[in-house]
C-alpha cells in the first residue's frame, strides 16, 4: 500500500497514478480492504483511470464487507445524501454510520452522535451521543475538537450535559454540569483530545 500511496502523491517525484492503480488492483484482488477502498476512490473520481462509479461502489461495498471503516462511513454518506446514483435511504445510512462508529471511525462517531442528538437513531439517547463524541475526541479527531469548541450549540443541551458528565467521569473536568461549553469544559475537551495545558 505504501508504494501505491507514494505514486498517488503529486508532490512526489514517484507520482505515477497508473502504477498506483496496478498496485492497488493487485492488493484489492487479493482481498485487501484498504486497497479496495482506495481503488474505489480513484474510480469514483476518475484519477488515472476512466471514471466508473459502479465499479467504485462495488469496491466500496467489498471493503465495507471486510469491516473497513472508511468505506462503511462513505457508504453511510452516499445512502444519506443519495450520491453516486444510490437512492437515499436514511435508515440504511444510519446503520452504516453506526457500524463505522462502532469500529471507532472518528468522522462516523461524530456524525452518529449528531444523528442521535437529532433524535433519529432509535434506541439511542444523549448519553450515547456524548459517549461517541468523547470517543471521537480520544481518537485524536482534530475536526471534532474544533467543532465542539467553535460551534458547541450544534448539539442540544442534553448531549452537552452528558458530555460534561463523561468528562467528569474520567477526571478531565471538575466544573458545573450546566451544558455550557465554557473555559473549563473547553479545557476538558482539549484534554480528552490529548492536549495538555
Question: What are these regions, as identified by a protein language model?
Answer:
Residues 1, 8-11, 29-32, 45-47, ...:
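Short helix-capping/linker turns of helical repeat alpha-solenoids
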Residues 157-158, 168-197:
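Short acidic, glycine/serine/threonine-rich helix-capping segments at coil-helix boundaries
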Residues 35, 71, 86, 108, ...:
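TPR alpha-solenoid repeat register
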Residues 2-9, 38-45, 49, 59, ...:
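Hydrophobic face of amphipathic alpha-helices that form TPR/SEL1-like repeat modules
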Residues 25-29, 61-65, 99-102, 135-138, ...:
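Conserved structural position within tetratricopeptide repeats
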Amino acid at each position: 500500500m505504501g508504494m501505491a500511496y507514494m505514486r498517488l502523491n503529486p508532490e512526489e517525484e514517484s507520482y505515477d497514478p497508473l502504477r498506483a492503480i496496478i498496485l492497488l488492483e493487485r492488493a484489492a484482488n487479493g482481498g485487501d480492504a484498504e486497497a479496495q477502498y482506495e481503488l474505489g476512490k480513484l474510480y469514483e473520481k476518475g484519477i488515472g483511470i476512466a471514471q466508473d462509479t459502479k465499479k467504485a461502489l462495488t469496491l466500496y461495498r467489498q471493503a465495507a464487507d471486510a469491516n473497513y471503516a472508511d468505506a462503511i462511513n462513505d457508504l453511510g454518506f452516499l445512502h444519506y445524501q443519495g450520491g453516486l446514483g444510490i437512492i437515499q435511504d436514511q435508515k440504511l445510512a444510519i446503520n452504516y454510520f453506526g457500524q463505522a462508529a462502532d469500529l471507532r471511525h472518528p468522522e462516523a462517531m461524530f456524525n452518529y452522535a449528531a444523528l442521535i442528538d437529532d433524535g433519529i437513531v432509535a434506541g439511542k439517547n444523549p448519553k450515547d451521543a456524548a459517549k461517541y463524541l468523547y470517543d471521537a475526541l480520544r481518537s485524536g479527531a482534530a475536526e471534532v475538537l474544533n467543532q465542539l469548541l467553535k460551534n458547541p450549540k450544534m448539539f442540544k443541551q442534553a448531549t452537552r450535559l452528558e458530555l460534561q458528565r463523561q468528562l467528569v467521569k474520567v477526571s478531565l473536568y471538575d466544573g458545573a454540569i450546566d451544558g455550557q461549553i465554557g473555559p473549563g469544559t473547553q479545557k476538558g475537551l482539549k484534554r480528552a483530545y490529548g492536549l495538555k495545558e
